[in-house]
């Protein structure tokens, strides 16, 4: 049957519809808001896939160009691989739902979200989260939670649910909040140096919106929800667990001590203890024994945190690992930094380019989009001592790069102050947790070292959480094991004045805003400590860019002169580029950017452009060239392509009968501009001769 439920979020209304489309899926919901329409389906395999080793959940989000009345650009007119925006939205959907599936559930599950109609003023990705939550809720998939997601904007201290593109661009804060009726499960944000209190207010506002949407989903469940398939999470054999614990606890506790052992040495010791312990078990117990060993490893970690109040490497809960910073480490690179924090190390480089180097983006929203600042994050296998393929960026790398880019964007100067395209690349050379935060810190340092006039450094810190019941421990600057066995990965980036980027993922059903408030304050203290180290290494941006970077010179011309610079079919501008070897970008408002690594070439191009676009000024003297003689005077070129009339009466101080007695074509003479009448320029040589004679007379006196 066809069912519709409407949710009111104040200025925005969301409609949930099911029973008309994709009826063979386990769950299918069409979400509408304005002209935006998103179809989300949830499907599950009948049999589990235990060989996967992890929950085999796949999320695919597609923004079809037909949704915006467009045809894909380029030669291939069919949608191809996912765009960066689509990949990030896949992660945005995956992260809040993954921890809510039952422990040990191994049936392949797939979420597909398709944007069928695009509203020119609304981002559909928050609707995709809502559709996913609704599709799972009404399906027979054993997903027991009702959750929702919402985008929150803030302007003039007021929070807005699902702001429009226009509102989002004007917003001081852009945050996506996902939560159940009981608490928060995921947060992702970009901001303009906002306070912790403002962020917390946005999260609380977003959670209230999530509750309203969840109530609508519950209403839909009552109308058409299927009976959930039975699933009981597997439990460990207590007898085998006790034997594994007896054999391994002492040695395993020592192996996990990273204050005593470095990361790779710890891994090797753990593997050795595991091998010895499992080999001692009967063959029929080995598979269960391996699971018991992994559970024991996690149990030791959590007991150390909550009962002994001790981290694996011996740090205090709010202590940050040792930081070392080197700037300018690569000679030919425009900007570079080697940032090391504990056993995590990032080599971050900056390349400066021109407007031609901007990243063009094809989006559903109207108009053309491009990026002049981009950050690319790489995670090669050697960073964790492994062998692997060097393929293109995966979803994780794209997600980490987007977080770092978002955190730094708030401090990137506008094009009017710094007309360069900037590409930051963060290569993770070593990793033991918080590598994305190393990308942010290293990126800020490398940008300043490259001469990008940022007004402040941006630092980042990853927070963790270990929680059981009412007991919990919040950790600052988490290492790899703390991320793996902990319950939260909460990344916070910003300046001394406020937060610019944030991302939170959890492995428990939800956390309260009270815990988030405490974590934000602890993160603020950690961020300030890191920023102090960064300012010691690079107090402010270099005043000059690298000698190997292109110099960009900016000049402004009248808009009616643009055609003179470009010429018919681009002939003139191509000629300037071929003659000087520079790059030239002309904007519609008459702004011209000339880029070249060679100053002389740039100056030559600027002079040509200045000559092409120059306008005569009354009373000013010019060195002109006689280009044509006529009976009533001569036409003199004072700028390339710009002639003025030198009347016969203005050629000499005495009366002349024939112009050719005084001038011939090709002569270079000094002339003064007497008057401007529309496009006509009146010149005088007589006035210049008179001035010269009077100066000579004064000199003799």
Swiss-Prot record:
PANTHER family per the UniProt record, alphabetical: POLYRIBONUCLEOTIDE NUCLEOTIDYLTRANSFERASE, POLYRIBONUCLEOTIDE NUCLEOTIDYLTRANSFERASE 1, MITOCHONDRIAL
InterPro entries reported in the protein's UniProt record: ExoRNase_PH_dom1, ExoRNase_PH_dom2, ExoRNase_PH_dom2_sf, KH_dom, KH_dom_type_1, KH_dom_type_1_sf, NA-bd_OB-fold, PNPase
Pfam families: KH_1, PNPase, RNase_PH, RNase_PH_C, S1
Domain KH: 550-609
Identification of the protein by name: Polyribonucleotide nucleotidyltransferase
Annotated Gene3D superfamilies: GHMP Kinase, N-terminal domain, K Homology domain, type 1, Nucleic acid-binding proteins
Superkingdom assignment: Bacteria
Enzyme class: transferase
Species in which this protein is naturally found: Solibacter usitatus (strain Ellin6076)
One record GO biological process: mRNA catabolic process
Single GO MF annotation: 3'-5'-RNA exonuclease activity
Family under the similarity heading: Belongs to the polyribonucleotide nucleotidyltransferase family.
Cofactors, names only: Mg(2+)
Matches recorded under NCBIfam families: polynuc_phos, PRK11824.1
Enzymatic reactions: RNA(n+1) + phosphate = RNA(n) + a ribonucleoside 5'-diphosphate
């Amino acid at each position: 049957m066809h069912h519709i439920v409407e949710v009111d979020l104040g200025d925005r209304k969301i409609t949930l519809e099911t029973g008309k489309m994709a009826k063979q899926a386990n769950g299918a919901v069409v979400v509408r808001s304005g002209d935006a329409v998103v179809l989300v389906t949830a499907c599950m395999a009948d049999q589990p896939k235990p060989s996967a080793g992890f929950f085999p959940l796949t999320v695919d989000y597609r923004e079809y160009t037909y949704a915006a009345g467009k045809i894909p650009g380029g030669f291939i007119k069919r949608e191809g691989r996912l765009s960066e925006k689509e990949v990030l939205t896949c992660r945005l959907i995956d992260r809040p739902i993954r921890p809510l599936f039952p422990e040990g559930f191994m049936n392949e599950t797939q979420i597909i979200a398709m944007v069928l109609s695009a509203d020119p003023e609304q981002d559909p990705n928050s609707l995709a989260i809502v559709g996913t939550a609704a599709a799972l809720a009404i399906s027979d998939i054993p997903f027991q939670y009702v959750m929702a997601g919402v985008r929150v904007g803030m302007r003039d201290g007021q929070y807005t649910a699902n702001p429009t593109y226009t509102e989002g661009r004007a917003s001081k804060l852009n945050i996506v909040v996902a939560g159940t009726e009981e608490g928060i499960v995921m947060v992702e944000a970009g901001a303009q140096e906002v306070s912790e209190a403002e962020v917390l207010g946005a999260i609380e506002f977003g959670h209230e919106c999530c509750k309203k949407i969840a109530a609508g989903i519950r209403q839909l469940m009552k109308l058409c929800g299927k009976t959930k398939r039975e699933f009981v999470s597997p439990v460990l054999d207590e007898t085998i667990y006790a034997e594994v614990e007896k054999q391994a606890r002492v040695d395993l506790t020592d192996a996990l001590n990273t204050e005593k052992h470095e990361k790779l040495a710890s891994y090797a010791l753990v593997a050795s203890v595991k091998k010895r312990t499992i080999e001692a078990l009967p063959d029929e117990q080995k598979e269960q024994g391996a699971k018991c060993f992994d559970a024991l490893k996690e149990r030791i970690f959590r007991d150390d945190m909550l009962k002994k109040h001790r981290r694996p490497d011996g740090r205090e809960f709010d202590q940050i690992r040792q930081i070392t910073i080197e700037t300018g480490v690569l000679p030919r690179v425009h900007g570079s930094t080697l940032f090391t924090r504990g056993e995590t190390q990032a080599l971050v480089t900056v390349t400066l380019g021109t407007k031609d180097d901007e990243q063009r983006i094809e989006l559903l929203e109207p108009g053309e989009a491009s990026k002049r600042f981009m950050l690319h994050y790489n995670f090669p296998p050697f960073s964790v001592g492994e062998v692997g393929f060097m393929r293109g960026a995966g979803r994780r790398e794209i997600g980490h790069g987007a977080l770092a880019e978002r955190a730094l964007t708030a401090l990137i100067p506008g094009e009017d102050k710094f007309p360069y395209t900037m590409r930051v690349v963060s290569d993770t050379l070593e990793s033991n947790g918080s590598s994305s935060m190393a990308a942010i810190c290293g990126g800020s340092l490398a940008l300043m070292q490259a001469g990008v006039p940022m007004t402040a450094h941006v630092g980042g810190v990853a927070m963790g959480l270990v929680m059981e019941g009412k007991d919990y421990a919040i950790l600052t600057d988490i290492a790899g094991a703390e991320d793996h066995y902990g319950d939260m990965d909460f990344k916070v980036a910003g300046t001394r004045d406020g937060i610019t980027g944030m991302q939170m993922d959890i492995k428990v059903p939800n956390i309260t805003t009270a815990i988030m408030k405490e974590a934000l304050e602890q993160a603020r203290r950690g961020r300030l400590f890191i920023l102090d180290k960064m300012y010691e290494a690079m107090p402010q941006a270099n005043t000059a860019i690298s000698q190997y970077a292109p110099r960009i010179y900016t000049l402004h011309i009248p808009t009616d002169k643009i055609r003179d610079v470009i010429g018919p079919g681009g002939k003139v501008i191509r000629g300037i580029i071929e003659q000087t070897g520079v790059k030239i970008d002309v904007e519609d408002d008459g702004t011209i950017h000339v880029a070249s690594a060679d100053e002389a070439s740039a100056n030559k191009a600027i002079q040509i452009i200045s000559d092409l676009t120059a306008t005569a000024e009354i009373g000013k003297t010019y060195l002109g060239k006689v280009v044509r003689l006529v009976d009533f005077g001569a036409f003199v070129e004072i700028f390339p392509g710009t002639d003025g009339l030198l009347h016969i009466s203005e050629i000499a101080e005495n009366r002349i009968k024939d112009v050719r007695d005084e001038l011939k074509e090709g002569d270079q003479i000094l002339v003064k501009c007497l008057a401007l009448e529309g496009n006509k320029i009146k010149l005088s040589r007589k006035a210049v001769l008179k001035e010269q004679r009077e100066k000579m007379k004064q000199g003799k006196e």
